């Protein structure tokens, strides 16, 4: 049982490292460098979309694994329903679940904004400068929200791992 729990925790933590680490790398390292490059706004956005699509190939499976392993771990702890509502551990877990749902919704909207037809419009210069700036702003804001939610969820996971006492 201890080995099973250790493996489960390892998979969960590795998936969190991929999701949160990759998101931070894109937001805190790649985006600022890209902003200072002498490319056009369209070229920068095209490159960011390509990087995002590539990242999604590993990030989405990592997020799915995080959700599944997190639900399983919560199920193990919550053998009694009163733990969820009558303890600080349960309260932290409820907050974490709400933030995970908010993260999934935010991420889905973020990905939906950059659909294939929008990407094709950018590549073929069929999008106005005004639309491009609006799109960039939405992408940046949703990306920032995703990163902030991810970091907060990671902190809540650390609190839960330490026993859920504040």
Label each residue range with its predicted role.
Residues 1-166:
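Polytopic transmembrane helical bundles with strong interfacial aromatic enrichment
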């Amino acid at each position: 049982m201890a080995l099973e729990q250790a493996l489960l925790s390892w998979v969960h933590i590795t998936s969190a490292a991929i999701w949160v680490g990759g998101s931070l790398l894109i937001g805190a390292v790649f985006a600022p460098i890209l902003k200072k490059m002498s490319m056009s706004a369209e070229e920068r956005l095209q490159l960011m979309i390509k990087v995002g699509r590539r990242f999604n190939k590993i990030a989405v499976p990592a997020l799915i694994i995080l959700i599944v392993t997190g639900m399983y771990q919560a199920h193990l702890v919550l053998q009694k329903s009163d733990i969820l509502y009558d303890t600080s551990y349960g309260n932290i877990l409820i907050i974490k679940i709400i933030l995970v749902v908010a993260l999934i919704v935010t991420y889905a909207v973020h990905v939906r904004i950059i659909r294939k037809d929008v990407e094709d419009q950018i590549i073929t210069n069929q999008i106005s400068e005004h639309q491009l700036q609006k799109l960039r702003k939405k992408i940046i804001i949703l990306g920032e929200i995703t990163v902030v939610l991810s970091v907060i969820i990671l902190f809540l996971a650390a609190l839960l791992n330490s026993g859920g006492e504040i």
